[in-house]
Amino acid sequence: MKKFIAILFIVIFPVISMAHMGHYNKYNKIEMEIFRNGELIGYNYYFFERNGEETIITNQFKFSVDLLGTTIFQVESYGEEKYIKDQLISFNSKTLQNDKEKFVNLELNKKTRKYDIKGSSFNGEATTNNVIGNWWNHKILQAGSQISPISGSIKEQVVTFIGKEKIDL
């Protein structure tokens, strides 16, 4: 169970300030299904909206884990990332996790060039090297730390490349 939660955390909860938005120009949405033991337990959707140099990515996800007929973990979230060119300028989310309300309100401070974060687990500043933990952006794999899109907390990470695989859809 711990391994499942850890993998789910890495998959669901891991956007660097320079997001290479051009890599995502052809996408209007990304839809992911979440499975556990071969059973569909939820979804994770990203919607891309563009207006000139501004891009807004909306994220919605919901899943629950049941064990012996009892729900042991449940989460539902809505988030919005806003970019001007490749620069993340804001991120806001609201989450209900096991009946507890969580949130993140992040803004780029133009004077300090750092993120001002007000979250349910963290209030303070973060450098723009941090990544919002959402999986549409491949930069999550290169970042040394991430900002939780659920609570705003900052988590150090080490990602080790172990191989390359082509997946045909």
Spans of features found by a protein language model:
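Short hydrophobic interaction/assembly module
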Residues: 76-86
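Solvent-exposed helix/loop surface patches that form functional interfaces
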Residues: 25-27, 92-169
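Short, low-complexity Ser/Thr-rich regulatory SLiMs
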Residues: 47-52, 83-85, 108
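Sec-dependent N-terminal signal peptides
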Residues: 4-13
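N-terminal cleavable signal peptides for secretion/export
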Residues: 17-78, 91-100, 152-169
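Hydrophobic residues embedded in beta-strands of well-ordered beta-sheets
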Residues: 53-56, 88-89, 112-116
